[in-house]
């Protein structure tokens, strides 16, 4: 209609084709007086846009099995509802489902820490899955076969100078700026199942032919 060629950059393409937005409404964690997590519940809403794309329902549910993150959560209940809106269709980007799952548990922990007056890093520390509990079966069916999550947390706190944050925040206030800090522990599963297959054929001449399928992972 324009009578001219149109070339869209990455920003225009993201805004005009598909997007990866997500709504999460976490409920408070059930915890004891010492901050130990007893149960988790969340009701999440996924904005799938005006039309459902081929994989539009993947981001809200792709990583629910690890929604507990690296924390020992004995009981969990998560409800996910996909809703149509007047926005672009939802499409998986890199890290499909991982940020969504991590956000829920990490946000709940931050809210719980504020509620009981405990440092957010300390609350994470006392709820980490201990190495001796591995292999660990989560309340949402996944089993973690390896991991030293507490050690990872401590290294991250040191590298990010978590202990020195209060002083940095005060310096920012003096300059009329606000400074915040966040902590997030994420876990990644490997070898997710797919529909690929392999076939070996032997012919009369003794030649062996191997047919193997592969799935592109989006790394170029």
Which residue stretches match the model-derived regions?
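Short, ordered loop/turn segments at secondary-structure junctions
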Residues: 9-11, 128, 215
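Helix-loop-helix junctions that connect adjacent transmembrane helices in secondary transporters/permeases
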Residues: 128-207
